[in-house]
Amino acid sequence: MTVGDLYRDLLSELLPQRQAHSCEVGRKAESVAGLVSPSLRGDLVVAATLHDIGYAHKQTGFHALDGARFLASMGFGTNVCNLVVQHSASQIEAEVRGINVNVFKEFEVGVDLDAAHSVIAWADMTTSPTGGTVMVEERLDEIQSRYGPEALVTAFIDRARPRLLAAGQSPMGSMRV
């Protein structure tokens, strides 16, 4: 049984393509979970699988924040919520959206999650919307094409591209570029 199977009810709230993407991101994270501390492996895989759940629970329109808040309301731990709220350079997206980055403080943790953040970014940036494996450059171009040149998401990708490219190169790619 996969984590995707365990969270099928939650994932069913997403569009079918996003379900496939989310399950594959979780599967990829699980395949390299040995790169993070044993105590974080479960949280890593859960967060990777549920990283886009905020698209189904819109409050602010910023899916990373909406997802973390939803998961917190469902009783998920702070590590999972932190990994969701900060996945794939989301602090840059918050800035582009005009959201004060202090919102991330509600999910602060007292442990080092850098390796787990890197794994999720790598898995997310190398997984297509339908769950296939892609090069990170293809993924970024696809996102911008899907949203269009005037979209906030396109502006976010433009600003975050160096970080996302680095993250997509390996499961331990740097989100600190």
Stretch-by-stretch model annotation:
Residues 25, 41-71, 81-91:
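His-Asp-centered metal-binding catalytic motifs of divalent-metal-dependent phosphohydrolases/nucleases
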Residues 1-6:
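Short alpha-helical hairpin
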Residues 10-38, 50, 76, 95-96, ...:
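Divalent metal-dependent phosphate-bond-processing catalytic cores, especially two-metal-ion Mg2+/Mn2+ enzymes
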